[in-house]
């Protein structure tokens, strides 16, 4: 038996919200018909029947349900594992790439002709609204990525893949240089079947070229969590030391990644 308590002084069926009136046939009112505020007696008793799940659903929506921390965690994971539902500008497309620390990766893509916007963030994990500290804990399964917005008429997806391969070593698992952790893994996260096909074919070609196993994961793009403003266009803004690096299209200056 489920019990619903109330502190309302003079509650009657006529004053109940519509959702509760609709289930009044499943409720039995305790006597007396009104209670002092200090009463601890149950106003309603809810007996199990075939419609009990529906009733409990309504009660849950009204804030009187029995959600557990596990339920909330599952909901958050479902959101984080859902698709990226952001919409690019008209005539533009999105692509996501993970290739180590996202500071240097973003600058590399900023320089690609046809790229109109870049953002760094977190994706592929289980935690909703993660922070940088969450990511660095190694417990959320997120990857540091750059989400690229580009004009497919001015920049092919293959051009983005070329930039991706050139920027990092895709044969080292969960590591790029001194940066170690699952957040630094190599990954291509696609939005369309065409992107997926191009990524798989490019990976096969690159593996033959290197004659080593390429560990790059190729997965559907999931919800993108924009990183803190501090990380956005980090090297272009000068980083910690204020040494700005060029974002000019086609620039081939070495990218110096510093904290």
Curated annotation (Swiss-Prot):
Enzyme class, broadest EC rank: oxidoreductase
Q: Which UniProt keywords apply?
A: Oxidoreductase
Q: Which InterPro entries did the record assign?
A: Met_Sox_Rdtase_MsrA_dom, Met_Sox_Rdtase_MsrA_sf, MsrA_MetSO_reductase
Q: Which organism is it from?
A: Lactuca sativa (Garden lettuce)
Per the record, the domain of life is Eukaryota
Protein name as annotated: Peptide methionine sulfoxide reductase
Name the Enzyme Commission number(s) assigned to this protein.
Answer: 1.8.4.11
**GO MF annotation list:** L-methionine:thioredoxin-disulfide S-oxidoreductase activity; peptide-methionine (S)-S-oxide reductase activity
- Family the UniProt entry places it in: Belongs to the MsrA Met sulfoxide reductase family.
Q: Does the keyword Transferase apply?
A: no
Name the reaction it catalyses: L-methionyl-[protein] + [thioredoxin]-disulfide + H2O = L-methionyl-(S)-S-oxide-[protein] + [thioredoxin]-dithiol; [thioredoxin]-disulfide + L-methionine + H2O = L-methionine (S)-S-oxide + [thioredoxin]-dithiol
Give the organism's phylogenetic lineage.
Eukaryota, Viridiplantae, Streptophyta, Embryophyta, Tracheophyta
Summarizing the function annotation, the protein's role is:
Has an important function as a repair enzyme for proteins that have been inactivated by oxidation. Catalyzes the reversible oxidation-reduction of methionine sulfoxide in proteins to methionine.
Which residue ranges are recorded for the region named Disordered? 66-90
Which HAMAP family does the entry mention? MsrA
Pfam families in UniProt: PMSR
């Amino acid at each position: 038996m489920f019990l619903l308590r109330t502190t309302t002084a003079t509650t009657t069926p006529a004053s109940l919200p519509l959702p509760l009136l609709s289930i009044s046939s499943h409720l039995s009112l305790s006597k007396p018909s009104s209670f002092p505020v200090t009463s601890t007696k149950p106003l309603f008793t809810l007996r199990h029947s075939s419609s009990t799940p529906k009733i409990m659903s309504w009660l849950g929506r009204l804030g009187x349900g029995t959600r557990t921390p596990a339920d909330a965690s599952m909901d958050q994971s479902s959101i984080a594992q859902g698709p990226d539902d952001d919409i690019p500008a008209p005539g533009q497309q999105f692509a996501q790439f993970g290739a180590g620390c996202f500071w240097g990766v973003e600058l590399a893509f900023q320089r690609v002709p046809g790229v109109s916007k870049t953002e760094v963030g977190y994706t592929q994990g289980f935690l909703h609204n993660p922070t940088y500290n969450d990511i660095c804990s190694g417990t959320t399964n997120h990857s540091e990525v750059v989400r690229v917005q580009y004009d497919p008429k001015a920049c092919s997806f293959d051009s983005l893949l070329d930039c991706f391969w050139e920027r990092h070593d895709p044969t080292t698992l969960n590591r790029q240089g001194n940066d170690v952790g699952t957040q630094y893994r190599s990954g291509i996260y696609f939005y369309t079947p065409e992107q997926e096909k191009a990524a798989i074919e490019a990976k096969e070609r690159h593996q033959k070229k290197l004659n080593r196993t390429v560990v790059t994961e190729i997965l559907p793009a999931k919800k993108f969590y924009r990183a803190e403003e501090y990380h956005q266009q980090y090297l272009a803004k000068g980083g910690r030391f204020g040494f700005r690096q060029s974002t000019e299209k086609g620039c081939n200056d070495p990218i110096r990644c510093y904290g």
